Amino acid sequence: MICGLDEAGCGPLAGPVTAGAAVLPPDFPVGLLRDSKQLSEKKRLLLYDLICERAAAQATAFIWPEEIDRINIRQAALKAMAEAFDRVRKQLPDVAEWRCLADGNQVPPVAVPCTAVVKGDRLIPEIMAASILAKTERDRYMLEADKLYPEYG
């Protein structure tokens, strides 16, 4: 079973780093997917809903600023990917063989074979789906945070 992994929030100065993990079924319309950064918000939200409805499994994970400050942003992103993968794995407990494909040039600390794919969010449908999950969940969190703390923009 292939699980795509990606993160959102490594560049911004505020908020959590968020990772997405996605396992797509064979009949998923992968031709609709793109890197989340290449999609309009409207299209990204539609694809987010489609992924949530049709993925074989999907999950997100947040690592919060306090931990980011303690372990650094790169390690936090990898930890978030590992946590998101663990959540996906629990959704499919009968799967014996796993393989992760992670966007970027490093792999998260998971106990299954994992390959780093540079620009994977533009190449691999499972990573594209994970990218959409991560960006959408992080954006939703940041919009809620803005309502609570509007002075921070």
What are these regions (language model features)?
Residues 1-153:
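RNase H-like, Mg2+-dependent phosphodiesterase core
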